[in-house]
Swiss-Prot record:
Annotated keywords: Disulfide bond, Glycoprotein, Glycosidase, Hydrolase, Lipid metabolism, Metal-binding, Secreted, Signal, Sphingolipid metabolism, Zinc
Lipoprotein listed as a keyword: no
Cystine bridges: 41-117, 44-110, 72-83, 180-185, 186-206, 341-389, 538-542, 548-561
One Gene Ontology biological process: sphingomyelin catabolic process
Stated name of the protein: Sphingomyelin phosphodiesterase 1
Cellular component per GO, a single term: lysosome
Pfam families: ASMase_C, Metallophos
Residues binding Zn(2+) 2, per UniProt: 234, 274, 381, 415
Gene name, Swiss-Prot/TrEMBL: asm-1
Native species: Caenorhabditis elegans
Leader peptide range in chain numbering: 1-17
Other comments on record: There are two types of sphingomyelinases: asm (acid), and nsm (neutral). Only acid sphingomyelinases have been found in worms. Does not require zinc ions as a cofactor.
Sequence positions that bind Zn(2+) 1: 165, 167, 234, 417
Obligatory cofactor(s): Zn(2+)
Amino acid sequence: MRIIYLISTVLLIYTNATVLRTKESIQNKVTYDKYGFQPLCISCTGLISVASFFLKFDVSEPVILEFATIVCKLFAKQPWAVCDGISSQFRDEFFYVFRRLANESPSQICGIILPDCADPTDPSESGWMVALPPKPKRTRISKKKVQKKPNMSMSQNLNVLQLTDLHVDFEYKYPSEANCDDPVCCRVSVSEPKKAAGYWGSVGKCDIPFWTVENMLSHINKTHMIDMVIMTGDYINHVDWEYSIEEHLSVLRKLHRLVQNTFPSTPIYWALGNHEGVPVNSFAPHSVDERFWPTWLYKEFQTMSGPWLSEGAKDSLLKRGSYSTQVMDGLKLITLNTGFCEVTNFFLYLNQSDPDSSMSWFVKELFESEKKGEQVYVLAHIPPGDSECLEGWAFNYYRVIQRFSSTIAAQFFGHDHLDYFTVFYEDMHNVSSKPISVGYASPSVTTFEYQNPAYRIYEIDPYNKFKIVDFTTYYADLEKATEDKKPVWEKLYSARQAHGMDDLSPLSWNKVIQKLFTSEKKREKFYQYAFRNFSPQCDSTCQMQLMCNLRMGHHNSTLYCPTF
């Protein structure tokens, strides 16, 4: 055995997928100092060399883990409980993966994880390409054939509710400290907190209490007519150093029961988020040992979405965490497991090439819909252009969107907790080319970190290729809520009104981007929407990243970013 858990320390310090949640990936962290060196690459190879020395002298795994915990404590500046918990969580996974990379040199291993440190060798096959079929003769579906299912309302347009990134914390305490030194606060009761946690939640390093989610769903049920609910992942809190399968199942079942009871006759579709993994971000493909397979999780999601899925869809969910289902005549919904693009899903570094054939399956489902003249909604958690998504997966996803842009009516994402959208182009390397599709990243329910809770409702025209006519985002200002005064859920904005749009076509969204890039006033309003009327410390780097997201469908370069 020539490789180590120590590399995990580099990842814990430099990626956003862990408790540190820096909002920047290791892919964007490789920089040069004034002498032309790459400190992160040097640190990576240095740690692996140290580990090789340890292992050469048969140092035991527990000792290596303890050393990794110490390094985590010193460099990541996290409490012992956090570093020790992460070490325990990832122990088996790390040793399993890195033992199988034993024949690779330190520079090759660092090149796998940090692309800008890349060695010419690519043992993980990150440059894989999914096969795309030629375009067939298109058959048009008649408007007369489009009929709502009995469980849908008979209104002209349909209302689709999106809830994402709930991150419910069943250990939320009131009163408690909201400004603590731990990665997640509002969990420890204190008599005199420096900053007291609010009863309904606290905007900051805190997740949302269960009773606030109950309040939100009750409000939605009383206020809106909902025809379909889409859940785009991350239902578990951010205390990922304490994750367990038993606790995950308990949270998922409580949340499923609440949502199901709120909308007993409404179709509800659930997607997996990276925080559903145990350890966090861990989604083992079937190419690794069976003991790592997240079968327990896939089975639970079978139960959660069960009433609305066919047996074939359930089988697909159990195989890859993804499924497709016929929502109504002329409309298919495809739910993708983006755990297979997660940059800290370490199993992928053994082989990134189409884990569990998910991308090939995605293409097959789209091709079938294309031949039938159907429209498709894509439901997933991590947007492909997010820094937490591997470029190999993002690049192939973008290619699929290009090929099937006339079939894909909309893409729905979560993950970033912020409110934004991404335009996809006919040429992924040229933002002056034709806009062909839009991905919607919906705002989170959780307040982690530093935004008010929100939900979104899309207005859909079922008689015009299931196009999104408009959407409205609602939020609650938790600073105005008290123990005796419930949150007020109110309209934040509607897309067409806020951005002065004639429609929500890719071309119209591209025009919105152009306006945002040239108008500081419009950008300020956009930032306000992104954080739901909360004033965070969003500096110039933060603001630039939000603008880059608008055209960042993958990670090719910074050409997507504005130059203001």
